[in-house]
Amino acid sequence: MDDIREMLEFRYCLEGGALLNRGNRITEHQIDELEKLNQECLRDDVTPREHWMANLAFHVALIHACGNDYIDQQVKNCMGWLTRAYAQFRWGVDKQELHMSCDCRHHKAILGALREKNSAKAVKMLKQDLGDFTLLK
């Protein structure tokens, strides 16, 4: 579990730093696209794998919108490693027992903060969002 926490801390440093430094550059069009991706994250009628892939797509697009290719690549790499951890927690569990959308409940607040051009608030909500990963068990 320590390695998972370290990866989440790494993601927070990368994603939070990108949002803090470049979040105000994200356009309304990009936020609209992120909202569409988030709709997929909020579905409870999908498999855990489908849910994870939607969440991964949201975070990758969020960081891509910040416009730093190196951070973008590092987040993708880290998300790849976290896919294995997520699989251990969720895959094979009956989707009727899960409320997968709960671990994406902060996405809307992140996007709202970005619309307000409030990068600090977006980072605060990102921290809460990443914290939900460790609550999966």
What are these regions (language model features)?
Residues R49-M53, Q73, L98-S101:
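Amphipathic alpha-helical packing segments from all-alpha helical-bundle domains
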Residues M1-E9:
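HTH-adjacent hinge/linker in prokaryotic transcriptional regulators
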Residues E6, L20, R43, H64, ...:
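Surface-exposed charged/polar residues within alpha-helices that form helix-capping/stabilizing sites
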Residues L14-L42:
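Amphipathic alpha-helical dimerization/coiled-coil segments
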Residues E9-R25, A57-Q96:
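Hydrophobic, amphipathic alpha-helical faces that serve as interaction scaffolds
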Residues K36, L42-R43, A57, A87-K137:
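C-terminal all-alpha effector/ligand-binding and dimerization domain
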Residues I31-E35, W52, D72, V123:
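Conserved positions within tetratricopeptide repeat
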